[in-house]
Amino acid sequence: MTRTDRLCVGAIAGAFGVKGEVRLKSFCAEPSDIASYGPLFTEDGGRSFRVTLTRPVAGALGARLSGVATKEEADALRGVQLYADRDRLPSLGDDEFYHADLIGLEVRDTGGALLGRVHAVHNHGAGDILEVTGAGRREALLLPFTRAVVPTVDLSIGRIVADPPEGLE
């Protein structure tokens, strides 16, 4: 399993005000930490930005990005995802994972049967949910990402062992 050198840490939600500020949606555990992981890059690496947080705004952070001086420039960046170099991010503890490292992992049940692969990781406020697809499934399998349901994550071999609650299989 190969690791990506950059991880998505946020996205630009649009312009904020008329002086080139942006509404920045942070995907970091502590939202304001996004500014300390810079420079941040576009997905293709074609642009980089230094981030200066200005104020909290509803559901996001107000921020200035280097090289963005007008509302029009800020508007043009709406929807752009921002990536940080992995080595700028904090070290993770045992049993902590970046979502990007889970996506694509093979998922097997405790008996060894293939359940599919992690397609996405969702969090709607109550904890992470793994979306597992493939292995002949017509619908995605949604697994709570808890130790009880996912007792083993082995990044070195690209595998998760899951023990889905009865009825979820």
From Swiss-Prot:
GO CC annotations on file: cytoplasm; ribosome
Keyword line: Chaperone, Cytoplasm, Ribosome biogenesis, rRNA processing
Ranges for domain PRC barrel: 94-168
GO terms, biological process: ribosomal small subunit biogenesis; rRNA processing
Keyword Acetylation appears in the UniProt entry: no
Chief place of localization: cytoplasm
Pfam families, per the entry: PRC_RimM, RimM
UniProt-annotated location(s): Cytoplasm
Xref: InterPro entries: PRC_barrel-like_sf (IPR011033), PRC_RimM (IPR056792), RimM (IPR011961), RimM_N (IPR002676), RimM_N_sf (IPR036976), Transl_B-barrel_sf (IPR009000)
Family annotation (SUPFAM superfamilies): PRC-barrel domain, Translation proteins
UniProt-recorded Gene Ontology molecular function terms: ribosome binding
Assembly: Binds ribosomal protein uS19.
Domain notes: The PRC barrel domain binds ribosomal protein uS19.
Protein's job: An accessory protein needed during the final step in the assembly of 30S ribosomal subunit, possibly for assembly of the head region. Essential for efficient processing of 16S rRNA. May be needed both before and after RbfA during the maturation of 16S rRNA. It has affinity for free ribosomal 30S subunits but not for 70S ribosomes.
Entry similarity comment: Belongs to the RimM family.
HAMAP family per UniProt: Ribosome_mat_RimM (MF_00014)
Official protein name in the record: Ribosome maturation factor RimM
Organism: Cereibacter sphaeroides (strain ATCC 17025 / ATH 2.4.3) (Rhodobacter sphaeroides)
